[in-house]
Amino acid sequence: MSKNCPECGSSRVVEDDLYSQKQWVCEDCGSVVSEGLLTTTLSEESHSRAVPFFTSTAAFKKPCRNLVSGFSRLRALCRIFRLSSSMEDASANLFERAYNHPNFLHISLSKKQILAGCCMFHICRQNSWPVFMGTIGYLLDADNYQMGTIYQELTKSLNLQTTQVCITRMLESFCYDFKLAPDEVEEVFSVAQQRLVDQTSALLELAADTWILTGRRPFPLFLAAVYVAWQSLNPLARMKYSLMKFCKIAKAPEQLWCKSKDTINKRLNELLEVLCKLGRELPWVRPTDIQMNTVTTLVEDILKHRKALLILAVKHYEKQLEETQTSQYSESELSDSKSSVQTQCKSPPDEEDEGCELPPDHWGKRHLFLPPCVRTQKRQKINEAPLEVTGDEDISDSEIESYIRSEEEIKLFAKARKKICKY
């Protein structure tokens, strides 16, 4: 080959070792003279453009392993709930959008799996599919609070519009979890599925009219309503069975009642209390005979005349309230009673005021059925004083002895104590 540079015409062409490949390079202009390269001349090098590494390898980039595991978990959930292929694809697309969002890039793997469940839950809500968030959280082994926070963050980050599912459709799917068909349990316990759904939905409408359903999670109230409806369909034979016994008879899933027994019992007592208030307004029943353990025998009549009984109960309560107010105003020691009530309600912030009664002129006294936030008083926050620990506190002998375990340490401590006492 010629020893002259084709760019500048210089004859100062030397051999240069580049790693394991030898090249001929011009010393004057620096161009590569040897063949076999993409660019061999200085003019070609001047017109070239640098390409970033991530751009050159974008076509061959593999998806992240966390994204792949999230997709597999999402598709497994879709198969469990038997979603259609279109809903499954929509859930996968939504999960991919959420996964690449900056708010979800640096979260843990467990939270990314919860994010996949939240994406499927949102698609189910859009298609009016009756799926509970608690059921998805149970399958993902996630806390309800944690799943709720991630779902709220998902809707805020992607500007998603949440849709509400009809409570009757949710109730139907909930009632089918109880195995109460004639071929599954004894005849005493069996009930038609549609009849149970109708009775439970009527009880839920009553709960909504009396503010029991307001601001509450649906699971505990659903279970309490199903239990009361099951008892009311054959009260004489089923009154002796408790709520937990009913769950075992119906083979209800454990996630429905095991973790929230206290909440379910509270909703059950509230529902029975409302039924007792309305049952006392029935003209053929003596009010003294109405009790919470026997009111299920009157559920059919109460639900049949629900609207009329609600009006009668409110009217009788307002009438009794007017009579009590007139009797109080007729007393001569009215001012003393007001001052005593005010002094009773003034309690220090560190004490619970659950037993404190509201003053007579409070608006909550004028209504029979109230929302839960009005019926129950809020617990006052206890501001604990911070512990002032400086590290210079004296340590008692009993506390020192509690840290000693072996006999050798006791002997060493006794010797050291004797030496200290000598000085």
Swiss-Prot record:
Zinc finger residue ranges, TFIIB-type: 1-34
Main location: nucleus
Organism: Danio rerio (Zebrafish)
Any one cellular-component term (Gene Ontology): transcription preinitiation complex
Family, as annotated: Belongs to the TFIIB family.
GO molecular function annotations of the record: RNA polymerase II general transcription initiation factor activity; RNA polymerase III type 3 promoter sequence-specific DNA binding; TBP-class protein binding; zinc ion binding
BP terms from Gene Ontology: cellular response to oxidative stress; regulation of transcription by RNA polymerase III; transcription preinitiation complex assembly
PROSITE patterns found in the cross-reference section: ZF_TFIIB (PS51134)
Post-translational modification: In response to oxidative stress, a Cys-residue is reversibly oxidized to cysteine sulfenic acid. This impairs formation of a ternary complex with TBP and DNA and down-regulates expression of target genes in response to oxidative stress.
UniProt feature, compositional bias: Low complexity: 325-340
Highest taxon above the source species: Eukaryota
SUPFAM superfamilies associated with the record: Cyclin-like, Zinc beta-ribbon
Subunit structure, interactors included: Component of TFIIIB complexes. Interacts with TBP and forms a ternary complex with TBp and target DNA sequences.
Keyword Cell membrane: no
UniProt feature coiled coil, ranges: none
Keywords (A to Z) from UniProt: Activator, Metal-binding, Nucleus, Oxidation, Repeat, Transcription, Transcription regulation, Zinc, Zinc-finger
Identification of the protein by name: Transcription factor IIIB 50 kDa subunit
Keyword Zinc-finger among UniProt keywords: yes
Location in or out of the cell: Nucleus
